[in-house]
């Protein structure tokens, strides 16, 4: 079979052939149809500052360095005094960075994801040097801290390693901090004593590492070890170790013994400030207020202005520093907010800093009944709406990272990470944060979920599949009743597995699982499974393993033949929904790569699949697979008229997908026979020929072409069948043997 690849170029539509037949069509037969790919470009730019460091430029003047998301990721340099943007440094082959610091020799270092490289920035020359990966096989670097003699330290995911870099030595790997754990989320360093501390998740460990001997000791309080509310941000200040846990509760510990010096408070910021010029005060944000801790008395509380009112930060701090006795802070990730506070007078100001907006990877896509296409940005959470007719995209506002979408009666339902919150948005009303969309409920605190990923409209209720929170096992199936507004949750419906795909077939809800637990866990299960829910009784039935060895059933749909079609890793499967019996498995190009893969049943009856960057078209009669695109196809969805929408992407050597900020559309070829006759064999006036039914390139099946109703006499029908089958033989669609069998069936139909 010949295959044709579709390649998109910016802002133009390409007409390329996608049909495939064994031999060229005869002159009397229609030519293979064409499809179009249109690139609608970047839908919105946005700001996401992961962390900021208040340092200096080459002349010793103050400068904020902010690690930002982007395609590629960048570090922005902003003047905190003049409030001007001074420079943007690109981090090639990255999508952003979770670590940023400045060494004692003035060099700025950033740690990236998903390539886990260290980048060196010279403030004097603006040169950016990619120093490479400090530890092989990692995807994220965290928690950069300076040491002595130009050395910096950091942590990694998924190996929970700690490493250092110095200009003279290069990289040094101190190894994994705790067996079986994946995250070394932050580090704190005492250069004088050559001791480092590492926050390890998601199992809950705080490792004290002697940098000279390599000795490791877990100083996390024994009653908290193993708790998924694990150490997240850590700072060594004034001889104390400040620890923010993943759910924001905080502790102050003795850095050598782990003894608790203070607790029962929260930290919302990315850790704390360093020690203030007074030699005793440490600052952080708690909720949306500025707080302080006195290391001389081990007391803490909100910071107050001259009038006694709490100093409001307006959000969590993501970087702290001191200038001329004042505290300076970057506030929040998304809006460029900042704060200064003068502890002498109590004066303070909240203001904006001009961090530059960047194109950011699209996290998810959904299409509305009115034809608009909505995109949601990774982590940042901005929601944009595209009018395909004009090509105009409108940025609506932030909803949070939507890992799943559903629709009912014109209302968009959104599953938002990290609180596993479900929201409802009416596109016909103005977008107003907090009211439209409005939050319906959360699944994190009471049910241990963090990503609602699968939505299925069952008429009277929306069913939602979700995956467990960090360090936990067991997804959930939630039913939201449209009339009452109530929801019910069934946790761990497939033991130790998440619920990641749903489809309604008849009066039954089908679900597919993933063996993966929450972030930082190792799977307990070995194979993904199917289950059903009777929509009348609510009874749940385990339907077994559709594809042996598959880790995830990533997509399910009611097929064009009335059967259940699904995708498990790189295998397409078809199941009889009545008996539950497996009908077919087809191995597809590509492999499961971590980005949600999808399949959709098109109005042309074919099934379209995105897998590992491929766009595939599956014939529902023969199960033949045609490759339409062999790269750059992610987060597929389909609109009401059958056009397919997806985002761009480039797959790296570590299988991470980057550069996904562009939205594209594939319009399938025109279908000459909508609603095709999909009976398995060719049937003439009720007589089964035994010949497999099949498609002509223009979308007509053989059964479509034999039109018994158009012929009043049997003689006319015979002439018609003879002519149709002759043309199909000439086109290479039927063999001569097939033709004889079909004509024979037509002959037997008289009587």
Segments (PLM) and residue ranges:
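Blade-level signature of beta-propeller repeat domains, shared across WD40, Kelch, NHL, RCC1
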Residues: 630-669
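Short, conserved, GDST-rich strand-edge loop motifs in beta-rich repeat architectures
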Residues: 464-474, 512-527, 651-658
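Soluble extracellular-acting proteins and domains
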Residues: 670-751
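Repeated scaffold domains used in trafficking and secretory/extracellular systems
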Residues: 46-55, 95-101, 138-145, 181-188, ...
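Surface loop/turn motifs at the tips and blade-to-blade linkers of beta-strand repeat domains
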Residues: 40-47, 88-93, 132-137, 175-180, ...
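Conserved beta-propeller blade signature
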Residues: 63-66, 107-110, 151-154, 195-198, ...
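Beta-strand-rich domains and repeat architectures in extracellular enzymes and scaffolds
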Residues: 40-73, 95-98
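Residue-level signature of beta-propeller blades and closely related beta-rich strand-turn architectures
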Residues: 69-70, 114, 158, 202, ...
């Amino acid at each position: 079979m010949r295959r044709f690849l579709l390649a998109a170029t910016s802002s133009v539509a390409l007409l390329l052939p996608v049909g495939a037949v064994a031999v060229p069509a005869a002159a009397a037969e229609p030519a293979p149809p064409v499809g179009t790919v249109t690139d609608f470009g970047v839908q919105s730019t946005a700001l996401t500052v992961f962390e900021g460091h208040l340092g200096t430029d080459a002349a010793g003047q103050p400068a904020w360095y902010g690690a930002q998301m982007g395609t590629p990721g960048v570090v922005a340099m902003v003047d905190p005094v003049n409030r001007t943007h001074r420079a943007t440094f690109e981090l090639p082959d990255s999508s952003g960075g979770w670590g940023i610091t400045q060494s004692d020799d003035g060099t700025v270092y950033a740690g990236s994801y998903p390539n886990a490289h260290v980048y060196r920035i010279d403030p004097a020359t603006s040169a950016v040097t990619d120093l490479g990966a400090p530890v092989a096989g990692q995807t994220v670097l965290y928690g950069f801290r300076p040491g002595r003699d130009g050395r910096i330290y950091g942590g990694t995911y998924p190996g929970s390693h700690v490493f250092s870099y110095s200009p003279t030595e290069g990289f040094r790997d101190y190894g994994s901090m705790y067996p079986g754990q994946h995250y070394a989320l932050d580090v704190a360093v005492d250069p004088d004593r050559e001791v480092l501390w590492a926050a390890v998740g998601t199992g809950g460990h705080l490792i004290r590492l002697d940098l000279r001997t390599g000795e490791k000791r877990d100083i996390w309080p024994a009653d908290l070890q193993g708790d998924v509310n694990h150490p997240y941000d850590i700072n060594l200040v004034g001889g104390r170790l400040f620890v923010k846990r993943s759910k924001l509760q905080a502790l102050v510990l003795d850095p050598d013994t782990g003894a608790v010096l203070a607790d029962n408070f929260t930290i919302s910021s990315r850790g704390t400030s360093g020690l203030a010029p007074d030699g005793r005060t440490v600052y952080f944000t708690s909720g949306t207020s500025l707080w302080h801790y006195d290391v001389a008395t081990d007391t803490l509380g909100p910071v107050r202005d001259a009038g006694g009112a709490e100093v409001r930060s307006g959000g969590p701090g993501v970087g702290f520093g001191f200038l001329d006795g004042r505290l300076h802070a970057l506030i929040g990730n998304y809006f460029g907010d900042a704060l200064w506070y003068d502890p002498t007078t109590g004066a303070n100001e909240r203001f904006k800093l001009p961090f530059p907006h960047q194109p950011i990877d699209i996290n998810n896509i959904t299409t509305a009944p009115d034809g608009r296409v909505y995109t949601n940005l990774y982590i940042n959470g901005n929601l944009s709406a595209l009018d395909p007719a004009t090509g105009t995209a409108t940025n609506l506002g932030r909803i949070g990272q939507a890992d799943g979408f559903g629709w009912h009666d014109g209302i968009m339902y959104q599953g938002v990470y990290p609180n596993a919150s479900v929201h409802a948005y009416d596109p016909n009303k103005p977008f107003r944060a907090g009211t439209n969309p409005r939050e319906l409920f959360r699944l994190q605190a009471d049910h241990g979920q963090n990503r609602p990923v699968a939505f299925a409209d069952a008429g009277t209720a929306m069913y939602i599949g979700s995956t467990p929170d960090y360090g936990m096992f067991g997804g959930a199936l939630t039913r939201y009743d449209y009339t009452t507004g109530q929801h019910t949750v069934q946790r761990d419906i497939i033991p130790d597995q998440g619920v990641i795909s749903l489809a309604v077939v008849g009066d039954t809800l089908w679900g597919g699982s993933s063996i993966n637990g929450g972030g930082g866990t190792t799977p307990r299960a070995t194979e993904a499974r199917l289950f059903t829910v009777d929509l009348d009784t609510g009874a749940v039935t385990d339907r077994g393993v559709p594809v042996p060895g598959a880790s995830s059933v990533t997509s399910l749909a009611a097929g064009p033949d009335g059967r259940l079609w699904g995708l498990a890793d790189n295998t397409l499967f078809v199941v009889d929904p009545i008996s539950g019996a497996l009908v077919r498995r087809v191995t597809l190009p590509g492999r499961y790569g971590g980005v949600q893969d999808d399949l959709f049943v098109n109005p042309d009856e074919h099934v379209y699949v995105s897998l590992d960057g491929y766009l595939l078209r599956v014939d529902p009669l023969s199960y033949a697979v045609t490759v339409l695109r062999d790269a750059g196809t992610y987060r597929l969805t389909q609109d009401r008229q059958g056009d397919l929408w997806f985002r761009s992407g480039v797959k790296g050597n570590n299988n991470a997908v980057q550069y996904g900020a562009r939205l594209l559309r594939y319009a399938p070829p025109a279908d000459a026979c909508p609603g095709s006759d999909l009976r398995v064999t060719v049937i003439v006036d009720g007589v089964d020929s035994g010949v497999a039914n099949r498609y002509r390139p223009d979308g007509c099946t053989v059964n479509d072409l034999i039109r018994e109703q158009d012929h009043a006499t049997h003689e006319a029908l015979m002439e018609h069948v003879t002519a149709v089958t002759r043309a199909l033989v000439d086109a290479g669609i039927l063999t001569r043997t097939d033709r004889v069998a079909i004509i024979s069936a037509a002959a037997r139909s008289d009587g």
